[in-house]
Regions:
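N-terminal Rossmann NAD(P)H-binding glycine-rich loop of SDR-like oxidoreductase domains
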Residues: 23, 31
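Active-site helix of classical SDR
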Residues: 106, 142, 150
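C-terminal substrate-recognition "lid" of short-chain dehydrogenase/reductases
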Residues: 118, 197-226, 231
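Residue(s) in the substrate-gating loop at a strand-loop-helix junction
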Residues: 126
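Short, small/polar-rich loop/turn modules that mediate ligand/substrate recognition or access, typified
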Residues: 158, 163, 219-221
């Protein structure tokens, strides 16, 4: 099996990626970065792939007749609600989009990667998979869950040349961050980070682009935090 992976790498590495949530923010930066490296990137929109509807995921996979070497599970939702008042609908919808839909995509694409002897999976997690915050119980639980799913992928598909990891960003300057915070609030967030600023989406994307490349030949089953030192304090 190792010979198959080396042969694929020497041929130029991965050639096609599927990136969810690629319309903006980290997902768009990842997709753009991969395309700049000559990789064909599939960027399904919600009309094509609605992660909140299991049947939509199944239909998308059925219609996908292209080889996918790279899967970046970036799309997710976060609807803050305190534990005591957390609704069943909020909990269920968060787990569906952030966990179950990703599991379905993995179940559909991993056998194809295994058959090719090469695959790279990265799920975008969060520092809140590792640190609790008021109102984030559904979101934090979903991110912790997807990290465990990815570790299982690493164990079960490692023998077939598939490496799977999570990247857990801290505060990132995405469109949503700007929409939800004024200048004073952004400064307050930056002061909580040892490096004194929030990350740019491109800083997350450049690491993911390396992690899914053939240059990464051994890192798997990990959750790598990119937070400017936030979790250290």
């Amino acid at each position: 099996m190792r010979q198959r992976v080396i042969s694929r790498s020497s041929a130029g590495g991965p050639s096609r990626a599927l990136v969810t949530g690629a319309a903006r923010g980290i997902g768009r930066s990842v997709a753009d970065t991969l395309e700049s490296k000559g990789i064909t990137v599939l960027r399904p929109g919600r009309q094509e792939l609605d992660l909140s509807i299991p049947e939509s995921v199944a239909d998308y996979l059925t219609g996908l007749d292209q080889v996918v070497d790279i899967l970046v599970l970036n799309a997710g939702i976060n609807n803050p609600e305190p534990l005591q008042t957390l609704s069943a609908d909020n909990w269920s919808s968060t787990q569906q989009v952030n966990v179950t839909a990703n599991l379905l995509l993995l179940q559909g694409l991993l056998p194809r990667m295994a058959a090719a002897g090469f695959g790279r999976v990265v799920a975008v997690s969060s520092v809140y998979a590792h640190r609790a915050r008021t109102g984030r119980v559904a979101y934090s639980a979903s991110k912790a869950a997807i990290e465990e799913v990815v570790r299982s992928v690493a164990v079960e598909y490692g023998p077939y040349g598939v490496l799977a990891n999570c990247v857990a960003p801290g505060f990132v300057l995405t469109d949503l961050t700007y929409q939800n915070n004024d200048a004073k609030q952004l400064q307050a967030l930056a002061e909580r980070v040892p490096v004194g600023r929030l990350a740019e989406p491109e800083e997350i994307a450049v690491f993911i682009s390396w992690l899914v490349s053939a240059e990464n030949s051994y890192i798997t089953g990990q959750s790598i935090t990119i937070d400017g030192g936030f979790l250290c304090v």
